[in-house]
């Protein structure tokens, strides 16, 4: 037994005040198990050391005596996860049970409802672009007007993401879901009143409402996964939630060319077909809105993971939305991920919006084939999303997986670019599928990686910022690629995207992998988080002369 005394170095000295009643051990301490038991009253401490020498102990004690340095900006909010007084205990500490966790069967219902109304919203995003030439003829507008029916989704997201994420963080998951589903339903019904050739502004109004609904939809997958699903299924749940949006885009590529064929010589038939598509969409959106009201709940009775339990038990009064945003932008790995996610997702949005124009440049009159190629692109991406989700749940290898998928997305874009004009439709189907598999499969990877490196910040805030970056890059890429496609050729526009994707690879390689949420779950499960009482040498009042606690936490995974 070795006692920490003045010869070895005081465990706590004047000028080194505890943080929230706890003293944080610096990350570079020597390995070895440290257990402690309180003996001879609250001030005496005996440490049983396995594999730790007295010299190492002295070095550790000396480190504790140094003045405490401020936490890094991205780590400040972690203090709200710790108990605030010496009388409280850390989850997983020896002698105290971890918070009760359980998985609710309702989680599958919540996930299904969200995926379905997200599907309808994505369908309404792409339903104009995939038959852009048909709507140009019906409304008598230019191709740029039809492109804006897609880009309005991206434009609306940027200014509205901050109030939307604030609402999610302060008012909760259910209200955000109700707004997303309700506005999606309202926008669908407004478009039903636009089936006349002079009412383009009405269809734009309906599309604007749907774009506002999207703001309350895109940031929810990672929040739903974290709040409702356990550590071993959270990545798969996030991928499934993203899958609903991708499936909507896939159906948006498939159904409009079938429901609204190009019958410009018969305007009445064309109006009837457009009306059928609009009324069918609004009926489904209304049904899903009612399901959301009835069955979508805020959270389960018990948290599904220790990380979620720690967040739910943190004092809500200490949470600051502005501080959370500030911490995220000071987190260098997250800023790099923000840029790289925006590049690859913006490229996908641009390709999806302009796919019909690219295909019809080389394959005249093949609107249905263009829709099927878009369907292939998105369906392949759905498979990629699910496989990536399973892979992350199984391995927890975020950085390497993200980098590999990014590289393969770049290669897929290069192959698609230089095979598009060969005149072989089957080649375009195959290359489009390869491109979609990796590019769309990246989406849940970005969400989950962001949650890991920004924990304990809100999942909705990090996801919302990622989507905002995607919308900004999507608008810029769509305008630039559309201009290059019109003035030069589709190949020129695609090469433009290839250059940006290559830049994204370089930035992804620079991201430091710091899996905070995963380390919290693993640390508690393995008992790696220890609470070690130490002698308090500071002159306090008799009531304050109690043992302090050193929280020893597992070090974060280092960068590659």
From Swiss-Prot:
Membrane-spanning parts: 100-124, 143-170, 173-192, 200-228, 234-259, 266-295, 332-362, 367-395, 398-420, 424-453, 462-487, 490-512
Residues with glycosylation annotation: 265
Keyword Cell membrane: yes
Location in or out of the cell: Cell membrane
UniProt-listed SUPFAM superfamilies: MFS general substrate transporter (SSF103473)
Keyword DNA repair (UniProt): no
Bias type Low complexity, positions: 83-95
Record: residues binding ethanolamine: 214, 471
Annotated choline binding sites: 471
Membrane topology recorded in Swiss-Prot or TrEMBL: Multi-pass membrane protein
GO molecular function, one term: virus receptor activity
GO annotations of cellular component type: membrane; mitochondrion; plasma membrane
Segments in the Extracellular topological domain: 125-142, 193-199, 260-265, 363-366, 421-423, 488-489
Superkingdom as given in the UniProt entry: Eukaryota
Classification via InterPro entries: FLVCR1-2_SLC49-like, MFS, MFS_dom, MFS_trans_sf
CDD domains: MFS_FLVCR1
Parts of the chain on the Cytoplasmic side: 1-99, 171-172, 229-233, 296-331, 396-397, 454-461, 513-560
Residue numbers carrying Phosphoserine: 56, 541
Polar residues bias spans: 550-560
Family annotation (Gene3D superfamilies): MFS general substrate transporter like domains (1.20.1250.20)
Region Disordered: start-end pairs: 1-22, 68-99, 537-560
Family per record: Belongs to the major facilitator superfamily. Feline leukemia virus subgroup C receptor (TC 2.A.1.28.1) family.
General function of this protein: Uniporter that mediates the transport of extracellular choline and ethanolamine into cells, thereby playing a key role in phospholipid biosynthesis. Choline and ethanolamine are the precursors of phosphatidylcholine and phosphatidylethanolamine, respectively, the two most abundant phospholipids. Transport is not coupled with proton transport and is exclusively driven by the choline (or ethanolamine) gradient across the plasma membrane. Also acts as a heme b transporter that mediates heme efflux from the cytoplasm to the extracellular compartment.
Protein name: Choline/ethanolamine transporter FLVCR1
Gene from which this protein is expressed: FLVCR1
